[in-house]
Amino acid sequence: MSLDKIMNEAISPWMKGDGPDSDIVLSSRIRLARNFKQYQFSTMQNEEEAQKVQELFKKKFINKAVEPFGKFGLLKMNELTPLQRRVLVEKHLISPNLAGTEYGACLLSESEHISVMLNEEDHIRIQCLFPGLQLSKALQSANQIDNWIEKEVEYAFDESLGYITSCPTNVGTGLRASVMIHLPGLVLTKRISRIIQVIQKLGLVVRGIYGEGSEALGNIFQVSNQMTLGKSEEDIIADLKSVMQQIIQQEKLARELIVQNSSIELEDKVYRSYGILANSRLIQSAEAATCLSDVRLGIDLGYIKGISRNILTELMVLTQPGILQQYAGGPLGPEERDYRRATLIRERLRIEKN
């Protein structure tokens, strides 16, 4: 695994595929939180203990192949520049919390759909990402990695409570399941607030594209479970999947309603946004996200032909500030970023059309 490859290829291999309900669901993620019995938790540990966790992983797991995932490499946060850390966050490979630690690290698969974060809020956080609505498949992969690690270490586990974690909401299975979903129909019909209220009443959490505290740029929302204690992994997955299927149905109905009642207005909105993306010389990230959402909706509804629906996911990542600066080879001012963002989008659309 090459750091240059990770940094210079903004789109992870798993992002290029499709999955069930990919017209609305962009990705499914499973995260398992675990702690080692022999060490203090990350929130309490000192530098020496944090380094011991890193050394344990370096000795036991680096460059070891796990079928069918291949080999894993180790990225240490204190060996990366702030810009490189930001790129990893923008690619959804690590959390903003891990990027801010000096003694954190990430065990990463070659396909980049599996990462194991070390010394974040817990000793390890196993993350698996899949395109579309594939929670069960993601859980299966996460459990394979979990079993692989558990052969070499003893987890902090209580017979009554389950896995012991730093945050009480993760105690139990330690499982956080989440789905990234594109909901322009519900936003345009002004039904999104009511839907979010219903989701929250069901014990789920709705966040923006980069998790807690982030905005829902481009009409992309992240829906996840909140509590894990007292529920099995299978029940958590089944509950979230059931809610997601209802949201998918509501989004489809909203899109149908717009097409029936406001077809010309919607088509105009889609093509105006396409025109902005195809011709702008300067574009800010928020405007780019809005226009990309409109174009993706136009592709899904058949208004725009000859452009891959994955363009939303791809360009939402490619046009983030960190990745733009990584491509530029160094820091960029706001206007320089807006110029490069617009240039990259125009070029990507031109290639797609040809």
Curated annotation (Swiss-Prot):
Ligand binding (ATP) = 27-31, 92, 125, 176-180, 207-212
Which domain of life, per UniProt? Bacteria
- What influences the activity of this protein, per its activity regulation comment? Appears to be allosterically activated by the binding of pArg-containing polypeptides to the pArg-binding pocket localized in the C-terminal domain of McsB.
Keyword terms: Allosteric enzyme, ATP-binding, Kinase, Nucleotide-binding, Transferase
Q: Where is the Phosphagen kinase C-terminal domain?
A: 24-254
Per the record, the GO terms for biological process are: phosphocreatine biosynthetic process
Give start-end ranges for motif RDXXRA motif of the pArg binding pocket involved in allosteric regulation.
337-342
Catalyses which reaction(s):
L-arginyl-[protein] + ATP = N(omega)-phospho-L-arginyl-[protein] + ADP + H(+)
Output the Gene Ontology cellular-component terms.
Answer: extracellular space
Instruction: Give the EC number(s) under which this enzyme is classified.
Output: 2.7.14.1
What NCBIfam families does the record point to?
PRK01059.1-4, PRK01059.1-5
Q: What does this protein do?
A: Catalyzes the specific phosphorylation of arginine residues in a large number of proteins. Is part of the bacterial stress response system. Protein arginine phosphorylation has a physiologically important role and is involved in the regulation of many critical cellular processes, such as protein homeostasis, motility, competence, and stringent and stress responses, by regulating gene expression and protein activity.
HAMAP family in the record: Prot_Arg_kinase
* Assigned protein family: Belongs to the ATP:guanido phosphotransferase family.
Name the UniProt record assigns to this protein: Protein-arginine kinase
